[in-house]
């Protein structure tokens, strides 16, 4: 099926639009036409036993909120209605943090419209989680601080958000393949973000391994040695948190170019994931600068944040610029280079210009947020075609990193897996 065929079908059959754009349907041929089939039907043979297992788990847990989520998610697998179980997950307060179901849309390269199934089993690190709760009291201030007109700001979105720092003990499905997730902000349902907020989950042991095994070595290879001392795990850790918080900041449901009130992902189509990941990265920096200025963060300063962020962009680009995170990183790198926030220092290395980095971040945040606020597909396309690309400069750096792991590959020995 082509993009054009899909769009022509919706144009000719507007009653099908909602089902066709639903996160939880597959599109298949039916005679000469197309039909949307709910996941609960398309994957019944897998989801029925999965629902049974969730009910078995619910029967043996003593935590009421975890039990509620597991039972609700089991029902969702068979009904295809995930709203109640997503609300139950946001409200869940359990020492075991469980995520299971269809969530991210990165695998849908045509429209970023279909969610893939994944699972995380984690244990909550309560002391670390408590340390970060202070930021939640300032989400409205961070929204107010966004570099866009007030008409584009949304003070309801994310107001009920929570933060959990966890230790990952098992993953499966979409979470297991390819680039390993370091943190996530869910659910993606804008109705729930508006009414209940979202949950930000940081996988601390994963983040530590990523920084140690690939992030820091890459940054030391790319940056001028004079700035090596500014590399900071605390800056990386907090920027990852603020990246996730920033998924809940800015526009979500908008009045689009067609006058309809819909999620901006509908209008941005295949460009949405890269725009959103880049927005979260850049707005994360912008909001973290706010936290530094207000003394909410004292473990590092702005120069350490700038250097750590710049140094780790190549880590994301190595995932592939066609991937949402890699494309977003290329966009950032090329934008900062154009604005003079990152400059060559000789011998293929680069330095961060602290005097220009903040303004470059502000300008890029404004551009990305405006695209999301207006649902401007053409503007998104122009931005990505100009900046989310490989360049001779980038291609000259990548070969020099080939001895550094692209990412980590977890082995869950507690689940019976063996080291290779």
Features from the language model and the residues they span:
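A well-structured
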Residues: 1-52, 68
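Contiguous, non-catalytic segments that form substrate-binding/exosite surfaces or channel walls
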Residues: 36-232
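An active-site-proximal "capping" alpha-helix that borders the catalytic cofactor pocket
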Residues: 63, 273-290
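Short, glycine/acidic-rich hinge or "gate" loops at secondary-structure transitions
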Residues: 64-72, 88, 258-259, 293-308
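Active-site recognition of the HExxH zinc-binding catalytic motif
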Residues: 235-252, 280-281, 285
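Post-HEXXH active-site segment of zinc metalloproteases
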Residues: 251-278
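Long, well-structured alpha-helical subdomains associated
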Residues: 285-382
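Extended, compositionally biased alpha-helical segments that mediate assembly or anchoring
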Residues: 365, 369-420
């Amino acid at each position: 099926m082509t993009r054009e065929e899909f769009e022509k079908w919706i144009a000719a059959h507007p009653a099908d639009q909602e089902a066709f754009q639903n996160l939880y349907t597959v599109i298949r041929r039916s005679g000469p036409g197309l039909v949307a089939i709910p996941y609960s039907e398309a994957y019944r043979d897998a989801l029925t036993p999965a629902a049974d297992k969730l009910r078995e788990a619910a029967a043996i847990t003593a935590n009421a909120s975890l039990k509620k989520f597991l039972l609700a998610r089991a029902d969702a697998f068979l009904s295809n209605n995930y709203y109640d179980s997503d609300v139950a997950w946001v409200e869940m307060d359990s020492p075991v943090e469980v995520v299971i179901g269809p969530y991210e849309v990165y695998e849908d390269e045509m429209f970023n419209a279909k969610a893939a199934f994944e699972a995380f089993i984690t244990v909550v690190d309560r002391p670390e989680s408590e340390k970060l709760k202070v930021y939640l009291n300032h989400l409205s201030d961070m929204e107010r601080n966004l570099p866009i007109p007030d008409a584009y700001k949304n003070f309801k979105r994310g107001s009920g958000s929570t933060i959990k720092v966890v230790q990952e003990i098992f993953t499966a499905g979409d979470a297991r393949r390819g680039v390993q997730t370091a943190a996530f902000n869910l659910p993606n349902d804008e109705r729930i973000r508006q009414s209940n907020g979202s949950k930000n989950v940081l996988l601390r042991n994963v983040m530590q391994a990523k920084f140690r095994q690939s992030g820091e070595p890459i940054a030391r290879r790319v940056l001028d040695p004079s700035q090596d001392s500014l590399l900071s795990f605390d800056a990386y850790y907090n920027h990852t948190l603020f990246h996730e918080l920033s998924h809940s900041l800015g526009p979500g449901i908008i009045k689009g170019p067609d006058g309809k009130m819909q999620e901006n992902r509908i209008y941005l189509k295949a460009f949405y994931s890269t725009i959103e990941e880049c927005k979260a990265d850049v707005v994360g920096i912008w909001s973290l600068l706010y936290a530094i200025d207000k003394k909410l963060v004292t473990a590092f300063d702005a120069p350490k944040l700038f250097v750590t962020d710049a140094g780790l962009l190549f880590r994301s680009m190595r995932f592939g610029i066609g991937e949402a995170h890699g494309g977003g990183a290329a966009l950032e790198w090329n934008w900062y280079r154009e604005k003079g926030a990152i400059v060559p220092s000789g011998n293929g290395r680069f330095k961060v210009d602290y005097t220009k980095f903040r303004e470059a971040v502000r300008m890029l945040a404004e551009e990305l947020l405006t695209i999301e606020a207006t649902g401007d597909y053409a503007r998104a396309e122009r931005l990505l075609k100009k900046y989310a690309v490989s360049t001779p400069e980038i291609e000259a750096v990548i070969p020099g990193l080939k001895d550094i792991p692209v990412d980590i590959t977890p082995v869950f020995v507690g689940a019976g897996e063996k080291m290779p």
